[in-house]
Amino acid sequence: MAIERVREYLRAYGREQDIIELDTSSATVELAATALHTKPERIAKSLSFMGKEQPFIVVCAGDCKVDNHKFKETFHVKAKMLKGDEVERCTNHAIGGVCPFAVPEGTAIYLDASLRRFDHVFPACGSANSAIRVSCEELETLVPRARWVDVCKQEAPQPAD
């Protein structure tokens, strides 16, 4: 199971006990925010893309979307998300549990500047019902090969019904 792989990965940093396992799904930003009793923007969503030759993950705030212009300027390719059947093979995690922890060596990891607005965020931990509360500094420590980028834009708030 991917969560066990993440638990082992986080054990090297003394953080395996900080994984939050939920009784309900946290597979989407909204579900995760509800389950964790936090705002959607504090969910660190992990988006998986295909580069020129290798897959990569961009971790961004839950209220953000990829800005196609910034993305192309940064990565020199159009934003092309991995297909459903490619996600687990390229990230070691199924859709709903994709995270920056315990991913294959060939998969690059980027942290988007949108995360820096918060004192802490909640990335998934390999399953559709797990997360961990971390600061951006802690995320940098837990994912030492990650690089910071600025490729997202904040979504416009939706009007209330």
Region locations from a protein language model:
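Extended, low-hydrophobicity, polar/charged segments
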Residues: 1-161
